[in-house]
Amino acid sequence: MAELISIDDTIDTAYDIFLEMAPDNLEPADVILFTAQFDDRGAAELVDVGDDWDDQVGFEVDKEIYAEVRIGLVNEENDVLDDVFARMLISRDPDQKFCHMLWKRD
C-alpha cells in the first residue's frame, strides 16, 4: 500500500469536491448561506469515522485508510461545527480513490 495522503491534503481534497458538488446537491438557499458565511464561520474538519458508513457504502470501512470530513458552519457562541452541510467518507490511499457524501437535507 502506498503512503497515505496527509490529513491536511485529505481535508483540502474533500473541500474541493464539496465545492464542486454542492450546487447540485444542496438547496439553493443553503449554497448561498454557506458561500456568504464561509469566511467567518466555515469549517472543514476531520472527525472519527462514523459507524454508519458500512451501511451507506456497502462494504466494511477500514478506519485506517478512510477518513470522515464534515463541512459546514461553526456556531459562533460555542465554536462547534453544528450546521453540517455534508459528511464525506474519503480514501486516504492515493491508489484507491473513493469518496461518498451524505448531504444536508431540510
Curated annotation (Swiss-Prot):
Domain of life per record: Bacteria
Pfam families the record matches: DUF440
Q: Which residues form a coiled coil?
A: none
The entry sums up its family as follows:
Belongs to the putative dsDNA mimic protein family.
HAMAP family linked: Put_dsDNA_mimic
The function of this protein is: May act as a double-stranded DNA (dsDNA) mimic. Probably regulates the activity of a dsDNA-binding protein.
Q: What is this protein called?
A: Putative double-stranded DNA mimic protein VC_1208
Q: Which organism is it from?
A: Vibrio cholerae serotype O1 (strain ATCC 39315 / El Tor Inaba N16961)
